[in-house]
């Protein structure tokens, strides 16, 4: 079985660092599936569910990413995410409330900094909601 190293890092912390046999990353071009020995590429990440297939694990490792940059090398994948949250740390009600608060923040922003922060919060909430939707739709 071929493996690659994967690093998922947010601006606050390292979310995942380890091996994977397959990774799906939501990019601006669509979902990108990456196996070991993939051609080198770079892409922008869009809000959504990043999915990792880890050797020895029965379930995928899911991480909500709100945007960022993806770098793929033949033996390593790095995702530098604006905001990233593991699925175990997500809650539907909190994510919906965060989305509403971010939307209100966008409409009430008094300056560019407040607007940018509200957009970042909205992207993070949307990413979590998309990841939770993925989990619900793929329950066995």
Curated annotation (Swiss-Prot):
Keyword Membrane on entry: yes
One of the record's GO cellular component terms: proton-transporting ATP synthase complex
Presence of keyword Cell inner membrane: yes
Subcellular location: Cell inner membrane
InterPro entries in the record: ATP_F1_dsu/esu_C_sf, ATP_synth_F1_dsu/esu, ATP_synth_F1_dsu/esu_N, ATP_synth_F1_esu_C, ATPsynth_dsu/esu_N
Membrane topology: Peripheral membrane protein
Keywords, alphabetical: ATP synthesis, Cell inner membrane, Cell membrane, CF(1), Hydrogen ion transport, Ion transport, Membrane, Transport
GO molecular function: ATP binding; proton-transporting ATP synthase activity, rotational mechanism
Assembly: F-type ATPases have 2 components, CF(1) - the catalytic core - and CF(0) - the membrane proton channel. CF(1) has five subunits: alpha(3), beta(3), gamma(1), delta(1), epsilon(1). CF(0) has three main subunits: a, b and c.
Family named by the database record: Belongs to the ATPase epsilon chain family.
Function description: Produces ATP from ADP in the presence of a proton gradient across the membrane.
Name the record gives this protein: ATP synthase epsilon chain
High-level lineage: Bacteria, Pseudomonadati, Pseudomonadota, Betaproteobacteria, Neisseriales
């Amino acid at each position: 079985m071929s493996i690659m190293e994967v690093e998922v890092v947010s601006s606050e912390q390292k979310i995942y660092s380890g091996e994977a046999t397959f990774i799906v990353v939501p990019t601006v071009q669509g979902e990108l599936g990456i196996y070991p020995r993939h051609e080198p590429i770079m892409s922008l990440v869009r809000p959504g569910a990043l999915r990792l297939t880890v050797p020895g694990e029965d379930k995928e490792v899911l991480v909500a990413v709100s945007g960022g940059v993806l770098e793929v090398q033949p033996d390593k994948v790095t995702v530098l995410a604006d905001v990233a949250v593991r699925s175990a740390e997500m809650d539907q009600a909190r994510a919906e409330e965060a989305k509403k608060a971010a939307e209100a923040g966008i409409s009430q922003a008094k300056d560019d900094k407040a607007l940018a922060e509200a957009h970042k919060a909205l992207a993070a909430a949307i990413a979590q909601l998309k990841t939770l939707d993925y989990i619900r739709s793929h329950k066995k």
